[in-house]
Swiss-Prot record:
PTM field: Phosphorylated on serine and threonine by host.
Disulfide bonds: C146-C201
Signal peptide annotation: 1-20
PROSITE patterns: IG_LIKE
Domain Ig-like: 21-120, 124-220
GO CC term (a single one): extracellular region
Subunit structure: Homohexamer. Interacts with human CSF1.
Glycan-modified residues: N95
Subcellular location as annotated: Secreted
Name of the protein this chain belongs to: Secreted protein BARF1
Stretches that traverse the bilayer: none
Length: 221
Protein backbone atom coordinates (compact mmCIF):
# COMPACT_ATOMS: atom_id res chain seq x y z
CA UNK A 1 0.00 0.00 0.00
CA UNK A 2 2.80 2.42 0.90
CA UNK A 3 4.43 1.72 -2.45
CA UNK A 4 1.15 2.36 -4.25
CA UNK A 5 0.65 5.70 -2.47
CA UNK A 6 4.23 6.70 -3.27
CA UNK A 7 3.62 5.95 -6.94
CA UNK A 8 0.47 8.09 -6.92
CA UNK A 9 2.37 11.00 -5.37
CA UNK A 10 5.11 10.59 -7.94
CA UNK A 11 2.56 10.54 -10.72
CA UNK A 12 0.92 13.74 -9.46
CA UNK A 13 4.25 15.54 -9.28
CA UNK A 14 5.43 14.43 -12.72
CA UNK A 15 2.56 15.49 -14.96
CA UNK A 16 3.37 18.79 -16.65
CA UNK A 17 0.66 21.17 -17.79
CA UNK A 18 -0.35 20.94 -21.44
CA UNK A 19 0.68 23.70 -23.83
CA UNK A 20 -0.72 25.14 -27.04
CA UNK A 21 1.68 25.44 -29.98
CA UNK A 22 0.90 27.24 -33.25
CA UNK A 23 2.63 26.43 -36.54
CA UNK A 24 2.27 27.80 -40.04
CA UNK A 25 1.71 25.20 -42.75
CA UNK A 26 5.12 23.79 -43.69
CA UNK A 27 6.78 24.99 -40.49
CA UNK A 28 8.75 22.72 -38.16
CA UNK A 29 7.77 22.85 -34.48
CA UNK A 30 8.53 20.91 -31.32
CA UNK A 31 6.16 19.51 -28.71
CA UNK A 32 7.73 18.88 -25.32
CA UNK A 33 7.10 16.48 -22.46
CA UNK A 34 9.02 16.52 -19.17
CA UNK A 35 9.24 14.03 -16.31
CA UNK A 36 10.22 15.72 -13.06
CA UNK A 37 12.43 13.02 -11.63
CA UNK A 38 16.02 12.94 -10.42
CA UNK A 39 17.28 10.43 -12.95
CA UNK A 40 15.84 8.49 -15.87
CA UNK A 41 17.79 5.72 -17.54
CA UNK A 42 17.36 4.32 -21.06
CA UNK A 43 14.84 1.77 -19.79
CA UNK A 44 12.07 4.41 -19.82
CA UNK A 45 9.55 3.81 -22.61
CA UNK A 46 8.18 6.93 -24.30
CA UNK A 47 5.32 6.87 -26.82
CA UNK A 48 3.72 9.76 -28.72
CA UNK A 49 0.14 9.56 -30.01
CA UNK A 50 -2.10 11.66 -32.24
CA UNK A 51 -5.51 11.91 -30.60
CA UNK A 52 -8.58 11.43 -32.75
CA UNK A 53 -12.32 11.66 -32.13
CA UNK A 54 -13.50 10.17 -28.87
CA UNK A 55 -10.89 8.01 -27.19
CA UNK A 56 -8.94 7.17 -30.36
CA UNK A 57 -5.14 7.19 -29.96
CA UNK A 58 -3.01 6.72 -33.07
CA UNK A 59 0.59 5.74 -32.31
CA UNK A 60 3.12 8.04 -34.01
CA UNK A 61 6.29 6.53 -32.61
CA UNK A 62 8.08 5.33 -29.52
CA UNK A 63 11.49 5.29 -27.87
CA UNK A 64 12.84 2.55 -25.60
CA UNK A 65 16.47 1.97 -24.59
CA UNK A 66 17.24 5.03 -26.75
CA UNK A 67 16.00 3.20 -29.86
CA UNK A 68 13.48 5.30 -31.82
CA UNK A 69 10.80 3.83 -34.08
CA UNK A 70 8.37 5.97 -36.10
CA UNK A 71 5.25 4.34 -37.53
CA UNK A 72 5.25 4.22 -41.33
CA UNK A 73 2.45 6.77 -42.07
CA UNK A 74 4.26 9.41 -39.97
CA UNK A 75 7.81 8.98 -41.27
CA UNK A 76 9.25 12.11 -42.82
CA UNK A 77 6.94 14.37 -40.83
CA UNK A 78 7.65 13.34 -37.22
CA UNK A 79 10.74 12.57 -35.16
CA UNK A 80 11.42 11.87 -31.47
CA UNK A 81 14.34 13.17 -29.45
CA UNK A 82 15.43 13.16 -25.83
CA UNK A 83 17.53 15.42 -23.63
CA UNK A 84 17.89 14.14 -20.05
CA UNK A 85 14.34 14.07 -18.62
CA UNK A 86 12.77 15.99 -21.51
CA UNK A 87 11.21 14.25 -24.52
CA UNK A 88 10.51 16.00 -27.82
CA UNK A 89 8.18 15.31 -30.71
CA UNK A 90 9.39 17.26 -33.75
CA UNK A 91 6.56 17.91 -36.20
CA UNK A 92 6.84 19.17 -39.77
CA UNK A 93 3.33 20.56 -40.24
CA UNK A 94 3.03 19.71 -43.92
CA UNK A 95 -0.73 19.20 -43.83
CA UNK A 96 -3.66 20.66 -41.94
CA UNK A 97 -4.34 17.12 -40.66
CA UNK A 98 -1.37 17.61 -38.32
CA UNK A 99 -3.55 20.08 -36.40
CA UNK A 100 -4.98 18.67 -33.17
CA UNK A 101 -4.13 17.10 -29.82
CA UNK A 102 -1.08 14.97 -29.07
CA UNK A 103 -0.36 12.69 -26.12
CA UNK A 104 3.00 11.67 -24.69
CA UNK A 105 3.00 8.54 -22.52
CA UNK A 106 6.09 7.93 -20.37
CA UNK A 107 6.36 4.56 -18.65
CA UNK A 108 8.96 3.34 -16.20
CA UNK A 109 8.26 0.02 -14.53
CA UNK A 110 4.75 0.19 -13.07
CA UNK A 111 4.63 3.99 -13.11
CA UNK A 112 3.09 5.80 -16.06
CA UNK A 113 2.89 9.53 -16.75
CA UNK A 114 1.05 11.25 -19.59
CA UNK A 115 1.07 14.75 -20.99
CA UNK A 116 -1.16 16.27 -23.65
CA UNK A 117 -0.34 19.15 -25.99
CA UNK A 118 -2.33 20.93 -28.69
CA UNK A 119 -0.92 21.91 -32.07
CA UNK A 120 -2.76 24.51 -34.16
CA UNK A 121 -1.76 24.51 -37.84
CA UNK A 122 -2.65 27.66 -39.77
CA UNK A 123 -2.16 28.72 -43.39
CA UNK A 124 -1.75 32.44 -44.13
CA UNK A 125 -4.31 34.02 -46.40
CA UNK A 126 -3.76 34.32 -50.15
CA UNK A 127 -6.20 36.19 -52.40
CA UNK A 128 -6.58 35.88 -56.16
CA UNK A 129 -8.96 37.44 -58.70
CA UNK A 130 -9.68 36.46 -62.28
CA UNK A 131 -12.34 37.49 -64.79
CA UNK A 132 -14.24 35.90 -67.66
CA UNK A 133 -16.68 37.36 -70.21
CA UNK A 134 -20.05 35.83 -70.94
CA UNK A 135 -20.16 33.79 -74.14
CA UNK A 136 -21.29 34.69 -77.66
CA UNK A 137 -23.45 36.39 -78.84
CA UNK A 138 -23.80 39.23 -76.32
CA UNK A 139 -20.56 39.32 -74.25
CA UNK A 140 -22.60 41.60 -72.00
CA UNK A 141 -21.61 40.26 -68.58
CA UNK A 142 -18.18 40.11 -66.99
CA UNK A 143 -17.84 37.55 -64.20
CA UNK A 144 -15.09 38.33 -61.71
CA UNK A 145 -14.15 35.57 -59.25
CA UNK A 146 -12.38 36.29 -55.97
CA UNK A 147 -10.80 33.26 -54.27
CA UNK A 148 -9.31 33.15 -50.79
CA UNK A 149 -7.17 30.23 -49.65
CA UNK A 150 -6.35 29.90 -45.94
CA UNK A 151 -6.95 27.94 -42.75
CA UNK A 152 -8.79 27.72 -40.40
CA UNK A 153 -11.55 30.26 -41.28
CA UNK A 154 -11.29 31.77 -44.78
CA UNK A 155 -13.96 34.29 -45.74
CA UNK A 156 -14.48 36.39 -48.87
CA UNK A 157 -16.86 39.18 -49.87
CA UNK A 158 -17.23 41.83 -52.57
CA UNK A 159 -17.68 45.52 -51.74
CA UNK A 160 -19.44 47.62 -54.39
CA UNK A 161 -20.35 51.31 -54.79
CA UNK A 162 -23.94 52.09 -53.82
CA UNK A 163 -26.54 53.19 -56.35
CA UNK A 164 -24.93 51.58 -59.39
CA UNK A 165 -27.34 50.66 -62.21
CA UNK A 166 -27.53 47.97 -63.34
CA UNK A 167 -26.35 46.56 -60.02
CA UNK A 168 -23.68 43.81 -59.92
CA UNK A 169 -24.78 40.49 -58.44
CA UNK A 170 -22.71 38.18 -56.25
CA UNK A 171 -22.97 34.39 -56.02
CA UNK A 172 -21.17 32.08 -53.62
CA UNK A 173 -18.89 29.70 -55.50
CA UNK A 174 -18.62 27.28 -52.58
CA UNK A 175 -15.83 25.90 -50.40
CA UNK A 176 -13.17 23.50 -51.66
CA UNK A 177 -10.67 21.50 -49.59
CA UNK A 178 -7.16 21.59 -51.06
CA UNK A 179 -4.59 18.77 -51.05
CA UNK A 180 -2.76 20.33 -48.10
CA UNK A 181 -6.00 20.37 -46.10
CA UNK A 182 -6.50 24.13 -46.34
CA UNK A 183 -9.78 25.66 -47.54
CA UNK A 184 -10.50 27.79 -50.60
CA UNK A 185 -13.60 29.99 -50.71
CA UNK A 186 -14.75 31.67 -53.93
CA UNK A 187 -17.40 34.30 -54.66
CA UNK A 188 -18.41 35.23 -58.24
CA UNK A 189 -19.41 38.81 -59.06
CA UNK A 190 -21.38 39.43 -62.27
CA UNK A 191 -20.84 42.92 -63.74
CA UNK A 192 -23.23 44.06 -66.51
CA UNK A 193 -21.93 46.63 -69.03
CA UNK A 194 -20.33 49.10 -68.49
CA UNK A 195 -17.61 47.32 -66.55
CA UNK A 196 -15.62 50.38 -65.44
CA UNK A 197 -16.86 50.69 -61.86
CA UNK A 198 -14.37 49.72 -59.14
CA UNK A 199 -15.22 46.75 -56.94
CA UNK A 200 -13.20 45.52 -53.97
CA UNK A 201 -12.69 41.93 -52.90
CA UNK A 202 -12.04 41.48 -49.18
CA UNK A 203 -10.52 38.23 -47.90
CA UNK A 204 -10.29 37.35 -44.21
CA UNK A 205 -8.88 34.55 -42.08
CA UNK A 206 -9.33 35.14 -38.35
CA UNK A 207 -7.11 38.22 -37.70
CA UNK A 208 -5.78 38.41 -41.28
CA UNK A 209 -7.31 40.61 -43.98
CA UNK A 210 -6.40 41.30 -47.62
CA UNK A 211 -7.98 43.52 -50.29
CA UNK A 212 -8.03 43.37 -54.07
CA UNK A 213 -9.55 46.24 -56.12
CA UNK A 214 -10.84 45.35 -59.58
CA UNK A 215 -11.25 48.19 -62.11
CA UNK A 216 -11.87 47.88 -65.87
CA UNK A 217 -10.27 44.49 -66.15
CA UNK A 218 -7.27 45.29 -63.96
CA UNK A 219 -6.55 44.13 -60.44
CA UNK A 220 -4.61 46.63 -58.32
CA UNK A 221 -3.23 45.47 -54.98
Amino acid sequence: MARFIAQLLLLASCVAAGQAVTAFLGERVTLTSYWRRVSLGPEIEVSWFKLGPGEEQVLIGRMHHDVIFIEWPFRGFFDIHRSANTFFLVVTAANISHDGNYLCRMKLGETEVTKQEHLSVVKPLTLSVHSERSQFPDFSVLTVTCTVNAFPHPHVQWLMPEGVEPAPTAANGGVMKEKDGSLSVAVDLSLPKPWHLPVTCVGKNDKEEAHGVYVSGYLSQ
